[in-house]
Amino acid sequence: MTILRVCCAVLAAALCVAAASVPVSTAGQTSRVKALPDPPGTARPSPVSRPRLTPLAEGEWTDVHKTIVAKYAPDGRPGNALRTLLNIPALADSFLSFPAYLTKGSTLSPRHRALLILRTAWLLNNDYIWSEQVPAARTAGLTAADVRRVAEGPDARGWSAFEATLLRAVDQLFRNSFVNDADYKALTAEYDVHHTMDAVMTVADFLTLGSMYNALGIQPDPWNPDRIPADVPYRVVVPKREPPLTTPRVEPVSGTGLAIARTFARHPALAAARKELGYINQQMKLDARTRELVILRIGWNCQSAYEWAQHVGSFGKGREMGLPIESIARGPAAPGWSPVEQALLTAVDELYRDSTVSDRTWASLSTHLDVVTIVNALISAAQYRQVSLALNTFGVPGEPGDEPLPVIGSN
């Protein structure tokens, strides 16, 4: 049996036990923890209603800030999102570069792009992205009825078959971190590989943006009056996630190097635009243990075998640095965590499940960490959720010697 098949078999077993509580023994007693948090979208997300990081006033801008503003707000009117991120200039520049490609330079038509982004904003209950993107949707030809119908979802009357497929794909990526075969095949019946990759990454990246905006309490800009329709019931209905892929949907280019890099090399323009991980891995001032702790937890929550293996092993070296790998899979309720580690794991779970971080967890983090460190930890989780969704959906094959996802509760 090949390594990839072993990984897939173990992952399938893990999925079977993950939905239930599993026993953990400590000091002769048995407690029960959940292997996975509840899935995203179980309830309507509740974004923070006030800023947790104050937008940087113009009087505090340095030349570095002014350069970033000129790049991302050439009209001279930076919104609350940009002014909030200016508190960490390197983050602002890397975090906003990929959305700039997705909204202006990708292969998608403006209409399809608008459908994907607005549906993602609705799932996150994020008024900032919704209000910012509705004008672009109108320019793309969406009527007021179309915009409302995005909130009503893929089963609303009036969508073309392919538009409904796009909306179903958004819902599945949000809930399942994956797109099932039938809908993926429907996507590729109309899209080539570049369009398909752009569509998946548009959803994945706006999930990152919106969940961070929710957690940071970034408020809509006054010049964007549109809001998510409050009278549309919050409902996310998707099929059960299918077993992990055994063959790639996006075949990596031939050659040496990691399969993830060779997969994204199929779309050079997309690969060139993905600079945001450079901040996390090279510029961010976050100790390696904390970074790998949160990345492994989000990889586990998304059941991303590739992401898990890379950060347990050769890339992140989580096991080598002494992280309790199986306890990460068991989550914040597992015994042995320090208070700050437990708070970090809880924050990752909330960001995944609730699309925000609760006041209680934020306060707990704040007793141990400064706000920049908190933001850096959360952005690590949010960005690697984006990566995990892509890895799962594109079927990026494992590397030789990869360590599989652990089977919690049965070993």
Q: Where are the predicted features?
A:
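N-terminal secretory signal peptides that target proteins for export/translocation
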Residues: 1-4
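Hydrophobic alpha-helical segments
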Residues: 19-411
